[in-house]
Amino acid sequence: KNIVPSLDSITASERTSKIAEIIPKGNFVKDKSTIRLEALGAKGAYGSTIISTELSLGNLVVRAPQGDFPANTNGTVTATAKITDSRGRTASKSIQLNVIDYYAPKILAFIANRAGNGTNKTVISTVLANVSPLIINGSNINRYNLKIQYSEKGTNRWIDAVNLSNETTEIINRQINSGAFYALDKPYNLRLVIQDRISDLADSVILIRSSEVLIALGDGRIGFGGFPELKNQIEF
């Protein structure tokens, strides 16, 4: 006779809703997923009762029929449910989970200059950044958006100059024409924004000076090498 307790199954589900919406069941994301394990259908045998349930994921253990675990490693991970009855007999079930390696978007460098040796309305940006792929069944599902926005200095009104969507390149190293929106006599803030499907956005802000000239005069201002930004000042 079978006098050991029985356990129907162990299940794993994603508790982070943003990830659950895009990642197929049974897959999780390192450092982003919260994995819920649950032991289902635990029963004693011949009058015994279940006195403990232990859930484990790697070296992490929760002593309960249900528990949440961080996804702190990548690769194939074993999840196990173990039950013990009132006679001290045990039963267990295990499943394999796939935890995908991931890192948040990283902006390594963002440089922008006016074209024509600093004398043009057109701005050319150089972007160096990394965006982690999420490879499932051979396909990268972590598409991201890359924006370059500009704002006249002191206004904090951001306008899109570049808007690239559904990008998948992991290592970004490119020059991007950021438009001819930049009046010669005004400085601008330029903002790079990268948003993937998992993390909060990454951004970087830099200053684009007014156009480079030998000397500029007017309205109580004098500028050498660029248009002056402050009244009653001499700027270099």
Predicted region positions:
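Surface-exposed, short loops/turns at beta-strand junctions within beta-sandwich domains
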Residues: 67-77, 173-187
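Short, solvent-exposed loop/linker segments at the N-terminal edge
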Residues: 11-34, 113-124
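Short, solvent-exposed loop/turn segments at the edges of extracellular beta-sandwich modules
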Residues: 83-89, 195-201
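Hydrophobic/tyrosine-rich beta-strand signature of extracellular beta-sandwich/beta-rich modules
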Residues: 79-81, 192
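Extracellular interdomain linker/stem segments of modular secreted and single-pass surface proteins
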Residues: 1-8, 98-107, 209-219
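Acidic, Ser/Thr
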Residues: 33-47, 126-139
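Low-complexity, small-hydrophobic/phenylalanine-enriched stretches
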Residues: 213-236
